[in-house]
């Protein structure tokens, strides 16, 4: 019987700095599915990365993965590069579906991002796998608590979101298998099994 491989990662001052940076950058943001402070999301993604065997560098990138996309584009990315280095800034760039404002249409952004991830760093793939598992878990919880009206908070609606999840699973699992992808596949099946929203064919809400 083989020994269980334990993650030997330790978190130092740079990780603490990333937490403070993310808290400042996302201070005014809330999660669309729960209203929780947005920092809860990046902390959850970082936790999944570390539990998956990720390095401190990957955990820092997880904490920062939405900073440029949501809060300042290239300007914030340059700040991340200055504070945390080129490698982490590249991971954050590859985790972003756009760095421009106003953002392009939802479907176009997602298609673009899928293309970017085909040649992304291995570290980016781990962060994105953790991000998708976290998002799918929260979506499942929202569907349990609020039912089909949950989809009103998503720009892609039910069909668009499931399309995106399936495409992400196909791409990410091809690059890297393991628990996160098994969990993502399970969550997609669970989400698909929830009843259709009566308003699913209507124009989606723009809050997503």
Which residues fall in each region the model found?
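Active-site helical microenvironments for divalent-metal-assisted chemistry
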Residues: 2-208
């Amino acid at each position: 019987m083989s020994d269980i491989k334990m993650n030997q990662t330790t978190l130092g001052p740079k990780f603490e700095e990333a937490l403070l940076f993310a808290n400042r950058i996302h201070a005014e943001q809330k999660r669309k599915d729960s209203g929780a402070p947005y920092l809860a999301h990046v902390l959850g993604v970082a936790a999944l990365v570390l539990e998956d065997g990720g390095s401190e560098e990957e955990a820092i990138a997880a904490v920062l993965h939405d900073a440029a996309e949501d809060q300042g584009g290239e300007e914030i990315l340059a700040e991340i590069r200055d504070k945390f280095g080129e490698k982490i800034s590249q991971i954050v760039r590859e985790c972003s579906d756009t760095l421009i404002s106003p953002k392009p249409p939802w479907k176009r952004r997602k298609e673009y991002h899928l293309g970017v991830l085909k040649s992304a760093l291995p570290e980016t793939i781990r962060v994105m796998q953790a991000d998708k598992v976290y998002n799918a878990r929260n979506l499942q919880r929202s569907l349990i608590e609020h039912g089909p009206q949950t989809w009103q908070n998503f720009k892609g609606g039910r069909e668009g979101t499931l399309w995106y999840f399936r495409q992400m699973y196909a791409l990410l699992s091809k690059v890297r298998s393991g628990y996160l992808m098994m969990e993502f596949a399970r969550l997609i099946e669970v989400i698909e099994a929830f009843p259709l929203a009566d308003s699913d064919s209507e124009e989606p809400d723009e809050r997503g």
